[in-house]
Amino acid sequence: MAKSAFLAALLATTVAAPAFAAPEPVPADVAADVAAMREEIAALRAEVAELKAGRDAAAASAPAPAPAPASAQAASASPAWKGAPQFEDREAGFSFKPKGLVQFDAGFVGIPGPELSGTVGGLNYNNLGWNSRARRLVLGAEGALPGGFGYNVEFNFAQGAVDYEDIVLTYQRPKSPVRLTIGNFYPLSSLETMTSSRLTSFLERAAFTDAFGYNRRLGAAVALVDPDKDLYTLTAGLFGQEINNAGFNRTGWQASVRGTFAPTVGDVRLHLGANFQHRVAQRDARNVQYRARPFTQVTDQRFVDTSLIAADGDDIAGLEFGAIMKSFHVAAEAQQLWVRGYRPGRTFGANDGVAGGLFYAGDPGFRSAYAEVGYYFTGESRGYKGGRWDRPKVLHPFNEGGWGALQLNARLDWLDLGDRVASGATLAAPYYINGGRQLGYELSLIWNPTDYLRFQAQYARGSYQGGPRAATVVPGSSEPINLRDFSVDSMALRAQVDF
């Protein structure tokens, strides 16, 4: 192109003449040179046109640049997946993950003794037999906020009402051993209680959880934890009453402490723990009551029940043990409860009272314990983290051609709600509390097709001695009311998904 332009300029310079100049004859040799130049310019122009045409054809035939791999685009645009999408901005310190839990139960609770009509002796026969219910319908979210803060919010919509599960705000700097928790959560009651209901070995937690009234409470706790090796926890908390209590007279409170130690000895992961709770009753309802269902909540009937006891509150001490040995696990806990009761004749102020609680001549004490063993036929191990049972990892998920995880569990669960607090001729207040004794023999089979899907079957036989229903179930016996024996069988199924 440059050469062509130069020749054109040279030609123009050579042949051009002022417009007003008179034409002069051109020598023959000059005319010949000009003609030769013109031919050369024409040839160069043809060559340039050919080169441009070739360049355009090559550009048109070249393949388009390959787009970025779809996986890379998805990775930059999609959230992480942990049972549900998790949105996270690590640089800013934000994260958000929706969560939920659905549990559907169906089962049968047997009728001890002859079937009677309606409610007799406090036992509602209409509420025994077959039943089904939505045990939990939980929706919520969890995540992180800048500066080491975190949150967890869960609402339970089962039974046509809104209940509150964990609703907490936490604070823990990265790698810090100190964690603060404020909100509505379980007050450090036991290994069973602190383990999520998504992950328990049986449909319901151990009997003392129900009997001793372990519910979430509004409070605050400070924990010392091991962020590196998960070797220990030590937590203390101060709590008020339940968050779903709409009254303004919530003067009851609780102080709790729990410690755990989880060393690994060879191939065995151990859990050793202890807990203590000091509970004070609401001042205008100074009473306590202890009762438990027969190992399932497909019925609301209880065969062990102390009724209301006039008391300032109670104190509870517990010991915890657990071990994971590859596909085996064992667990055991024991708790002792002491009631701080009021004696007959006790008087109260204008705004105090026992609200129907019975007075006893001494301070009753109750106790409960369980022991269980479990085994995964498919090679998994029970999960453990932070002083509680955690989610197992399914080795061969159903969606990848495997059979999922299959686990068998067996448990003995003992509860004693009877106590003679003073010498007397009767098996009633103020000398004796006939709350009854319950011994459960339980089996459960759990199938996890994937990490977040669970199907569970359970059988339980409850053996009872005494209690408030013994006279109705075993009428006409020559045995004292507190020694009359009967049994109740129950079977239940659960379908569960969580995210």
Spans of model-derived segments:
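Gram-negative bacterial Sec-dependent N-terminal signal peptides
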Residues: 1-20
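N-terminal periplasmic/intermembrane-space "pro-region" immediately following the signal or transit peptide
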Residues: 20-103, 109-117, 377, 381-396, ...
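Outer-membrane beta-barrel pore domains
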Residues: 25, 125-126, 288-499
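Secondary-structure boundary/capping motif
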Residues: 34-35, 41-49, 154, 168, ...
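Short solvent-exposed loop/turn micro-motifs enriched in small/polar/acidic residues
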Residues: 80, 162, 213-215, 312-314, ...
